[in-house]
A protein has these predicted regions:
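A short acidic, amphipathic alpha-helical/loop segment
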Residues: 33-34, 59, 82, 108
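Acidic helix N-cap motif at the loop->helix transition within catalytic regions
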Residues: 29-32, 54-63, 104
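Conserved donor nucleotide-binding strand/loop of the catalytic core
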Residues: 57-82, 86
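Conserved hydrophobic beta-strand within the GNAT/NAT acetyltransferase core sheet
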Residues: 22, 44-47
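Well-ordered beta-strand positions
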Residues: 44, 66, 89-91
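N-proximal low-complexity "stem/linker" segments adjacent to membrane-targeting elements
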Residues: 1-37
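Catalytic-site signature of metal-activated, phosphate-bearing donor transferases
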Residues: 2-9, 17, 77-84, 90, ...
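A conserved acidic beta->alpha catalytic loop
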Residues: 37, 41, 49-61, 72
C-alpha cells in the first residue's frame, strides 16, 4: 500500500458520478483489495456475483458494495451487461477482482471524466507475472450510455 497522500476529489455535486462495475465468482482472496483500491474514489460499487461458493459476497458487502447475483451465463458479455444495467453513475469503471486502480491514476481520471466530449477512456493495464508484454490497453472507463454494451464472450470490450 502506498503512503502517498491521495489527491483531493472535487465534491460529488461538482463532478460526474462514477460507478464501479465488477463481475465475480469465488474471488474471496482478491476482492477486498480491488474494492479498497477504488473506495472513496467511486460513488458506488456494484458487484455481480455469478455463483460464488466462498465468502466473496460477504466480503464485497462488508466493503460497501451493492451485490446482485445471477447464474453464470456461459460467457462474459451477458454478465458484464447485466452488471452495467445495475450501475447508476454517469461514468462506469470496470475492474476484475484481481485488478487494482493505482492511487496516482485518480486525479487524471477525474479530469478526463469531466470532459463532455469523451465517451470511452482507454486504460493501461499492467499484468504482474505476464510471460509476454505485461502491458495492454483496455477500454474499462466509459460514459454510461445505452449504446455501449459488451459484445465478446472472452476479453469483452465495449468499443468493438
Amino acid at each position: 500500500m502506498s503512503s502517498l497522500p491521495l489527491p483531493e476529489q472535487p465534491p460529488a455535486a461538482e463532478r460526474p458520478r462514477l460507478s464501479l462495475s465488477m463481475i465475480v465468482r469465488d474471488e474471496a482472496e482478491r476482492i477486498e483489495a480491488a474494492l479498497a483500491s477504488v473506495a472513496g474514489f467511486v460513488d458506488e460499487m456494484v458487484v455481480l456475483d455469478t455463483g460464488s461458493s466462498d465468502d466473496t459476497v460477504a466480503i464485497a458487502e462488508r466493503c460497501g458494495a451493492v451485490v446482485a447475483s445471477m447464474p453464470w451465463p456461459g460467457d462474459f458479455a451477458p454478465a458484464r451487461n447485466r452488471a452495467l444495467e445495475l450501475v447508476r453513475g454517469d461514468w462506469v469503471l470496470v475492474l476484475d477482482a484481481d485488478e487494482r486502480l493505482r492511487p496516482e491514476a485518480r486525479a487524471p481520471l477525474l479530469e478526463l471524466i469531466a470532459r463532455p466530449e469523451l465517451l470511452v477512456i482507454t486504460l493501461l493495464r499492467e499484468e504482474e507475472g505476464a510471460l509476454q508484454s505485461p502491458y495492454s490497453s483496455v477500454s474499462r472507463l466509459f460514459r454510461r450510455h445505452p449504446a455501449l454494451r459488451w459484445s465478446r464472450p472472452y476479453h469483452a470490450m465495449v468499443d468493438d
